């Protein structure tokens, strides 16, 4: 990979320093400072605010493969973390082109100002295609991203920092990303020209308890849109506390970090919840937590799956869906025990993307059916979960699609 082009005379104001000693120079954007993180790439063309505020990206620097990011500005609605002030999302960002002036009727501010407010350190003006190709070849590297408007850097110290960081393996970041308190969620999905509406107390027909490992807002909105009263509880909530809320269904949320580390406290809770006949649905980290609770294993991926254009096959329907993905760990399909069926696979690399327990109202997926951003091919999974709740109540099933 090359640093700044040879014809550039501007002094670099940001550096990306990889653990192998590679130094990439560029122009600084967003917040100033230095942070250690894992570098990944995302292939989505749109939805950069939702990507950067997704708690699953905590501990990561996101490289956008699409060259023009920020030209529709930033707004106060396209946010996915529950507590924006806590900044539970990506810690760094890399763009090909500099951020232009925004042009969109929803824009409330320039993306650079928004990045500063979020504390996201950024770099632009580099060959993101070369960086992406490097990641595909070598895997997601540990790195340091640094931004100093004066362009003053201790490169050797940054190299040492990048090399010394242990990476995401073994890190329980769910305890950081979780909201830390129980609360009721009633905001419904966004509607054109109307914005967000709320679910009335009398309209709530079902009660879902969501274990928050770093949950995205749009997941909760889709539950509310199906007339579910959602109670969000912290990641370390006990099974007894969950069951005391008398849920009709239990949801295991997405989140960041190493599932094996989070599983040290989450797996025993889920195993106790599985002793009941309450329907259980998991997404992303929640899928991995469920797999661990059932006796399977998880593993670190080479380059991860990050984007809004990933093909997945649903073996339960035979259909191929284009979905959003964001994960750097995966369930080892060969470790799934007897009685647990693999329901979805990635058509990029064949990795596991879903499971269900035979004869039980329990299933999960690795991808993000709520999208935000991305296609809505998998929205039916929320109705599938609701139908498990309805079946338990003796109510007829709704059409999934």
Swiss-Prot record:
Active site, renumbered: 284 (nucleophile), 368, 370
Reactions mediated catalytically: hydrogencarbonate + L-glutamine + 2 ATP + H2O = carbamoyl phosphate + L-glutamate + 2 ADP + phosphate + 2 H(+)
Gene3D superfamilies, per database record: 3.40.50.880, Carbamoyl-phosphate synthase small subunit, N-terminal domain
GO biological process: 'de novo' pyrimidine nucleobase biosynthetic process; 'de novo' UMP biosynthetic process; glutamine metabolic process; L-arginine biosynthetic process
EC number: 6.3.5.5
Pathway: Amino-acid biosynthesis; L-arginine biosynthesis; carbamoyl phosphate from bicarbonate: step 1/1; Pyrimidine metabolism; UMP biosynthesis via de novo pathway; (S)-dihydroorotate from bicarbonate: step 1/3
One protein family per Pfam: CPSase_sm_chain
GO MF annotation terms: ATP binding; carbamoyl-phosphate synthase (glutamine-hydrolyzing) activity; glutaminase activity
Enzyme class: ligase
Subunit: Composed of two chains; the small (or glutamine) chain promotes the hydrolysis of glutamine to ammonia, which is used by the large (or ammonia) chain to synthesize carbamoyl phosphate. Tetramer of heterodimers (alpha,beta)4.
Family from the record: Belongs to the CarA family.
This protein's name: Carbamoyl phosphate synthase small chain
Gene that encodes the chain: carA
């Amino acid at each position: 990979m090359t640093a700044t082009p040879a014809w550039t005379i501007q002094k670099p104001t940001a550096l990306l320093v990889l653990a192998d000693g590679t130094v990439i120079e560029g122009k600084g954007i967003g917040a100033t400072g230095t942070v250690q993180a894992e570098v990944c790439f995302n292939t989505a063309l749109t939805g950069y605010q939702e990507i950067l505020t997704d708690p699953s990206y905590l501990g990561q620097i996101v490289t956008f493969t699409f060259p023009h990011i920020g030209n529709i500005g930033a707004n106060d609605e396209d946010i996915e973390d529950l507590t924006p002030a806590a900044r539970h999302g990506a810690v760094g960002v890399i763009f090909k082109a500099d951020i232009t002036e925004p042009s969109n009727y929803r824009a409330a501010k320039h993306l650079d100002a928004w990045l500063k407010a979020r504390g996201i350190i950024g770099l632009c003006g580099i060959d993101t295609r070369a960086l992406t190709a490097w990641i595909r070849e070598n895997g997601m590297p540990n790195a340091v991203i640094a931004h100093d408007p004066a362009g003053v850097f201790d490169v050797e110290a940054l190299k040492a920092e990048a090399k010394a960081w242990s990476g995401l393996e073994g890190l329980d970041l769910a305890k950081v990303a979780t909201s830390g308190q129980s609360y009721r969620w009633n905001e419904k999905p966004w509607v054109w020209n109307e914005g967000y509406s709320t679910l009335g107390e009398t309209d709530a027909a079902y009660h879902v308890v969501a274990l928050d490992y770093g949950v995205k807002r749009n997941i909760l909105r889709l539950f509310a849109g199906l007339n579910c009263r959602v109670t969000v509880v912290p990641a370390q909530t006990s099974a007894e506390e969950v069951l005391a809320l008398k849920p009709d269904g239990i949801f295991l949320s997405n989140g960041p970090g190493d599932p094996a580390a989070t599983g040290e406290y989450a797996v025993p809770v889920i195993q106790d919840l599985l002793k009941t006949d309450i329907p259980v649905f998991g997404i992303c980290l929640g899928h991995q937590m469920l797999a661990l609770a059932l006796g399977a294993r998880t593993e670190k991926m080479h380059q991860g799956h990050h984007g809004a254009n990933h093909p997945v096959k649903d073996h339960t329907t035979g259909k191929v869906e284009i979905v959003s993905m964001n994960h750097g760990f995966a369930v080892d399909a060969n470790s799934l025990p007897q009685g647990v069926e693999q329901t979805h696979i990635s058509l990029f690399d064949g990795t596991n993307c879903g499971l269900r327990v035979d004869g039980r109202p329990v299933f999960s997926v690795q991808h993000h059916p709520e999208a935000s951003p991305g296609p809505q091919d998998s929205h039916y999974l929320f109705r599938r979960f609701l139908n498990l709740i309805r079946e338990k109540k003796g109510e007829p099933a709704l059409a999934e699609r």
